[in-house]
Amino acid sequence: MTKKNTLLLIDGYGFVFRAYYAQQPLTSPKGEPVGALYGFTSMLLKLLNDFKPKHAAVVFDSGGKNFRHEIYPEYKANRPPPPEDLIAQLPLVRDVARNLNFPILEKNGFEADDIIATFAAKTASIGEEVVVISSDKDLLQLMNDNVKIYDPLKAKYITEDNVVEKFGVTSDKLREVMALIGDKSDNIPGVPSIGPKTASSLITQFGTVENIFNSLEQVSSIKQRETLQNSKEAALISWQLIGLDYNVDMDFKLDALEWSPPDHNKLTEFLHEYGFKSLYKRAENLFDIKISEHKEVIEEKAVEIKDISNKAELEAFAEKAKKVGIFGIYILQNKGANIAFILSLKNQAYIIKISNEANNLFTYNSKADNEWFTDIIFNLLTDQSIKKITYSLKPLLKFYASRAQQITAIEDLELMNYALSAGLPQKNLFEAVEKEATIEEAAKIVVGFIDLYQQTILELKDNKAFRIYKEIDLPVCFVIDKMEKAGIKVDANYLNQLSSEFGAEILKLEEEIFVLSGMKFNIGSPKQLGEILFEKMQLPFGKTSAKANSYSTGADILEKLSEQGYPIADLLLRWRQLTKLKNTYTDSLPKQIDNITRRIHTTFLQTSTTTGRLSSQEPNLQNVPIRSGEGNKIRQAFVAEQGYKLISADYSQIELRILSHIADIKALKQAFINKDDIHTQTACQIFNLQKEELTSEHRRKAKAINFGIIYGISAFGLAKQLNVSNTEAAEYIKKYFAEYKGVQEYMEATKSFAQANGYVTDFFGRKCFVPLINDKRLKQFAERAAINAPIQGTNADIIKIAMTLLDREIEKRKLKTRLVLQIHDELLFEAPIDEIETIMPIIKQIMENSTNMDVPIITEIRAGNNWMEIH
């Protein structure tokens, strides 16, 4: 964000040309080229978001000749004309600026550089600050205390040190050096054979070009002296050409350049007209508006939808796809079962009905009715020269079962959108048609895949999210698919036995509860339980919920009753714990064992969290309890196949290590570098004790403080967790911030950034949106989420990178070891016993070195027969 009256001066055509060459070709709904316009619009939106200026202007060249051509007719004579598709867009660039409500500055006979110089000088003369947005080196001459240069290509302010490093002189001497060097792009001659090093040396010695020629005899090199003597006129002309005109005759009123948000309707119409749908969300977030959905442009065109029912028709499509080099593909599902393949080219959709009654991972293409099309499509999917665009890649990978890993050159629109907007509602393109299983309507959406891909890939690059998508999210999707197909073995007999044990104890607990309450009732009914506790038994803490019109019987109430010595509360808490474990795990897991593989195959969701974390469902194997004896008994049910062992590789204190790096907490960094026990160190500082004086309770509390701080815990929350007073908890937090200087500053800076931008970023640049950050009712929750998101997001991306690298290494070595589960910080492998000694060091080395940070990343790794043994 800029200072109050800062003027932002934007080099218009500099942006437009950069946008054109940086973007892939893009056409509007009318078929006109708009790639440069899209890039220019995206760049201006980014500037508004990053700088939030009060005053701003986009400055354009007027075209034609100017005073420099009078000095030197060959000025810019060598420049080739712009490409034809760019020329067609140039008259429209001012519309982009106008629709974003930017004032425009231009004047016949003057270049944008001179107008920028004039307005920068006049603004600085009244004591206000100027930020020039340009990558043009000529404008570096303007740098001073009041005029800053921001290079959008490098996304940073240019400093005097940067200028000295590149040109050997400070900005006030840049004109002199550049006059000697010349500029081929503008056909400015300079002095032959004099480069930056020689030029800076001469200017350092003589001060100006004029002084060099006034003191030529003092130039020590005879060859340089002769060259200079022969090029005096060229050097002096170059000096005039490179200099900026600070006195362009234009009215200057800073107030006239005040920027205000654009007209909602005009902006909406503009974005619709040019088909910039991928910019809607950014415009909505930036200007706090809602852009209404126009009817899809693709539906307005004549969309041809054909059924493909035989091999010859599909082969004809394949030939077309090979010629154009790109096509859309989607598997339409209804209640999890595949019902159609939909293929698309521009304005054409092709439907192949799938004969598949069974809804099973391993029987998707087993029916003879499907054989005629599966191989032809597979050949297209594995052709590196043809790009495939899909939405939700995993059903396609499931369809091709063991052959899925050969699929290449494929892009996933769902993952692309997630890389742009984690934390915002993820719109399912096919939600409506999947409910109704309307194949024709789905086909119309698939027809738009190619255009949507071309727009979204540009937005990924504009938002610096391309690497996140291409190097993290897309490759790990293939690894997740393999992991889901591998599944994990569970001992069903053991779970049934455990379920019986839990059931017996539950019955015993129920009898004791009924005795204490004096009657039988439905313990699982909060309403009945509340009436028993607070009406019949007259226990304290009874409060009714206005919405439910019943007593609150949550864990917090039962824990309060337990602290007051009411034995029924302990029995109820234990009953709830056991019934949840029985219902969720010991009863449920055996029912979810696949009939073919005899293993459990969970589904990992890749786009459901704010931070990039994976989540698990059907069943959720990431929430298997760990901190209780019963939880460990359940983990004992997860076993290795005969002749195999399970390997657990778990990142140690990864979130604290990430915090130390991204917040630059020197005390934390040093502790990790020294391999100190961080919880012991924290305990010593918080409780003012020596290491030998600490108890396990001190360390437990320190651990809770360390990890609680990461999640933005309040004094109240910490007090409850540690069972201490609010005052004591507040003192712990105060001491923590004093010991680990920088943590509190990081938290405040992160909250401020989130409030200003609506998102935070992780170590890799992933944007984690926090849409509720400015909602007064949910502000504290959103602030805690904002503080933790960069840490949790970095953690998630580190382990996803490691998963991909490990998968590649296992494939390269042709090992039988396979990844079977990901549980946030932990990876669980199943390995043949004879591969254990080989694979364990590989896993540890790759996990610890997948990302470079200022502190070591440590992995704890163990092998055993079941999950409990190794955790």
Swiss-Prot record:
GO biological process, one term: double-strand break repair
Gene3D superfamilies recorded: 3.30.70.370, 5' to 3' exonuclease, C-terminal subdomain, 5'-nuclease, Ribonuclease H-like superfamily/Ribonuclease H, Taq DNA Polymerase, Chain T, domain 4
A GO MF label: DNA binding
Chain ranges of the 5'-3' exonuclease domain: 1-283
EC number: 2.7.7.7
Recorded superkingdom: Bacteria
Keyword Nucleotidyltransferase set for record: yes
Catalytic function, reaction form: DNA(n) + a 2'-deoxyribonucleoside 5'-triphosphate = DNA(n+1) + diphosphate
Entry keywords, A to Z: DNA damage, DNA repair, DNA replication, DNA-binding, DNA-directed DNA polymerase, Exonuclease, Hydrolase, Nuclease, Nucleotidyltransferase, Transferase
InterPro entries: 5-3_exonucl_a-hlix_arch_N, 5-3_exonuclease, 5-3_exonuclease_C_sf, DNA-dir_DNA_pol_A_CS, DNA-dir_DNA_pol_A_palm_dom, DNA/RNA_pol_sf, DNA_polI_H3TH, DNA_polymerase_1
Classification via CDD domains: DNA_pol_A_pol_I_C (cd08637), H3TH_53EXO (cd09898), PIN_53EXO (cd09859)
Short name of one Pfam family: DNA_pol_A
Subunit structure: Single-chain monomer with multiple functions.
Protein family: Belongs to the DNA polymerase type-A family.
Summary of the function given for this chain in its UniProt record: In addition to polymerase activity, this DNA polymerase exhibits 5'-3' exonuclease activity.
NCBIfam families linked to this entry: pola, PRK05755.1
Protein's name in the database: DNA polymerase I
Origin species: Rickettsia bellii (strain RML369-C)
Biological classification of the source: Bacteria, Pseudomonadati, Pseudomonadota, Alphaproteobacteria, Rickettsiales
Gene that specifies this protein: polA
